[in-house]
Amino acid sequence: MAWTSVLLMLLAHLTGCGPQPMVHQPPSASSSLGATIRLSCTLSNDHNIGIYSIYWYQQRPGHPPRFLLRYFSHSDKHQGPDIPPRFSGSKDTARNLGYLSISELQPEDEAVYYCAVGLRSHEKKRMEREWEGEKSYTDLGS
């Protein structure tokens, strides 16, 4: 039986100011060719995945990383150029998880997959204002 190994690594996409979210991924996963695999990306508990977009990247041996997709919600997502629909994103907000599903696994899917998070622009601006307010308040107390 042929197996495709899918290695996972950590990538934290840092956006904005203030405390940054951390993402955690299992070190590896594997499945059979032709099957579907779901890779997970857990956001640190002090951040709510509901306000973040999840970005997924693939890096094949000897190649630079390539953008696969961005997922915020079913109605707010973006597939990378030339990325087939068998790559899809989803979220579990109750468990603070983002997922990359790859269906119909093929030999060329053997790669390192990176997840990253980024705030939606309006949330990023709100959090930057809050952080600047906290910083100003702290500076006044000095």
UniProtKB/Swiss-Prot annotation:
Q: Locate the region Framework-1.
A: 20-41
* Complementarity-determining-2: region residues: 71-81
Signal sequence, start to end: 1-19
Alphabetized, the UniProt keywords read:
Disulfide bond, Immunoglobulin domain, Signal
What Gene3D superfamilies does the annotation carry? Answer: Immunoglobulins
Name the segments for region: Framework-3: 82-115
Query: What Pfam families does the annotation carry?
Result: V-set (PF07686)
Q: Any keyword Signal? A: yes
Tissue specificity of this protein: Only expressed by pre-B-cells.
SUPFAM superfamilies under this entry?
Immunoglobulin
Q: Where is this region: Complementarity-determining-1?
A: 42-56
Chain residue ranges for the region called Framework-2: 57-70
| Any Gene Ontology biological process | B cell homeostasis
Highest rank taxon of the organism: Eukaryota
**Disulfide bridge partners, by residue number:** 41-115
Q: Give the UniProt family note.
A: Belongs to the immunoglobulin superfamily.
Q: Which PANTHER family match?
A: IMMUNOGLOBULIN LIGHT CHAIN
Q: What does this protein do?
A: Associates with the Ig-mu chain to form a molecular complex that is expressed on the surface of pre-B-cells. This complex presumably regulates Ig gene rearrangements in the early steps of B-cell differentiation.
- In its UniProt entry, what is this protein called? Immunoglobulin omega chain
Naturally occurring in which organism (per UniProt) = Mus musculus (Mouse)
